[in-house]
Amino acid sequence: VQAVPPDVKGEEGKEEVEDMDGDDNAPTVAAFAILFILSFLYSTFVTVVKVQQ
């Protein structure tokens, strides 16, 4: 009985990963990319402002 739950979780985990690789993961990746770009632009902006000052 103890050996069954890990196997079931493993199978469900693989299925969830496969689903996330599809349409479900696209918004997450897009949001992460947008946040990364915004943070990069913000850090660049702060650096430029400091240099000008």
From Swiss-Prot:
Q: What is its main location?
A: membrane
Stated membrane topology is: Multi-pass membrane protein
| Expression (tissue specificity) | Expressed in the spleen, pancreas, peripheral blood lymphocytes and at low levels in the epigonal organ.
UniProt key word Oxidoreductase:
no
Subcellular localization, per the record? Membrane
| Keyword check for Cell membrane | no
Mark the transmembrane ranges: 29-49
**Keywords on this record?**
Adaptive immunity, Immunity, Immunoglobulin, Membrane, Transmembrane, Transmembrane helix
Q: Where is this region: Disordered?
A: 1-25
Q: Name one GO biological process term.
A: adaptive immune response
Which terms in the GO cellular component ontology are assigned? immunoglobulin complex; membrane
Locate the compositionally biased regions of type Acidic residues: 13-24
| Protein name (database record) | IgW transmembrane form Tm1T3/Tm6T3/Tm3C4
Q: To which species is this protein native? A: Ginglymostoma cirratum
Top-level taxonomy: Eukaryota, Metazoa, Chordata, Craniata, Vertebrata
